[in-house]
Regions:
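Exposed, interaction-prone regions of secreted/extracellular proteins
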Residues: 1-301
Length: 301
């Protein structure tokens, strides 16, 4: 069962409302939540414009580029208005695609200042598109699957603390919208066990994020023909509404035990590249260091 999301940051562009997802701004009426307990793949419904016409989602690159978008938050921002999207990442391409990607991802300390939304994740894509850096994909069939940490935690939960992160599993497209699993609390200092595994030749995948401390997890299943080959792997820092360098953690983000497989075997000769298409006007001290084929560290301060 799918329900429309109401928790994530929204903004208005050219008369349409957009939601900040971990792959850019998507029309809000096309961003859905699926219950983590429902592991049968729930297909995304058709995405249509406000006038009821089928649309290809051309995402707003930022929430306030070109003066077309009014910010929901009037707080002064010391960073440039287009300082969002993928701000740090590492990439690896295997033309034959992947059958799984697994890793551990640390849960950093909470930023001292609150961004609109900060996303941290590993992910698998079908094309090499970098939100807010490379031109938007104007053809259909772009996708990404990803277990995602987000700050702040946004769901209503009496147990959530001010410094807690949220954790979900995501599937995002630019022509059919996005689908996310139920948000769970991810406390700072924990570790996320990330798992994206292909379960069928028809493009079926399980996207799973579990907490090492408790075993709590948030999972979704997806089946789409566009997912048959996912040849691009990433680890990423993505932000929307970052209001200065204090909207980053103090501690590093650690991606460890990275593993990629194809046809039942480990992918050989993995060579990650740090920021091959970098943020053009970096303002903070973000940096990505490739420690090895299995370990990548992102620092913020």
């Amino acid at each position: 069962m799918l329900t429309l999301d109401t928790s994530l940051p929204r903004t208005v562009l050219r008369g349409e409302e957009y939601t900040a997802t971990p792959s850019g701004w998507i029309l809000s009426h096309c961003v859905w939540e699926t219950a983590s307990s429902a592991l049968a793949s729930a297909p995304l419904p058709p995405c249509v414009s406000a006038k009821g016409n089928p649309v290809l989602l051309t995402q707003a690159q930022t929430q306030h580029r070109g003066g077309e978008v009014k910010k929901d938050d009037p707080t002064p921002n010391p960073l440039p208005p287009d300082y969002d999207g993928w701000l740090q990442y590492a990439a690896f391409n295997n033309t034959a695609g992947f059958d799984s990607m697994t890793n551990k991802m640390s849960v950093p300390d909470a930023p001292s200042s609150r961004p609109q939304i900060l996303y941290l994740f590993p992910g698998l894509q079908n094309i090499n598109w970098i939100p807010a850096i490379t031109p938007e994909p104007m053809k259909a069939h772009f996708d990404i699957i990803q277990p995602v940490l987000q700050y702040p935690y946004l769901s209503a939960d009496a147990e959530a603390g001010a410094g807690d992160w949220g954790l979900r599993s995501w599937y995002v497209t630019v022509d059919s919208g996005a689908k996310m699993s139920t948000e769970i609390i991810a406390p700072a200092g924990d570790v996320v066990l990330c798992n994206m595994t292909k379960t069928g030749a028809d493009g079926s995948w399980i996207i799973d994020a579990a907490l090492a401390s408790s075993g709590k997890r948030t999972t979704q299943a997806v089946t789409e023909s566009r997912l048959i080959t996912q040849p691009w792997a990433y680890v990423t820092v993505e932000c929307y509404g970052c209001k200065g360098c204090s909207t980053y953690p103090q501690k590093p983000l650690l991606f460890t035990e990275l593993a990629l497989t194809k046809d039942g075997a480990a992918v050989p000769s993995i060579a990650w590249r740090a920021n091959p298409k970098p943020q053009p006007k970096q303002q903070c001290k973000e940096a990505t260091k490739i420690i090895s084929s299995t370990d990548i560290t992102v620092t913020f301060q």
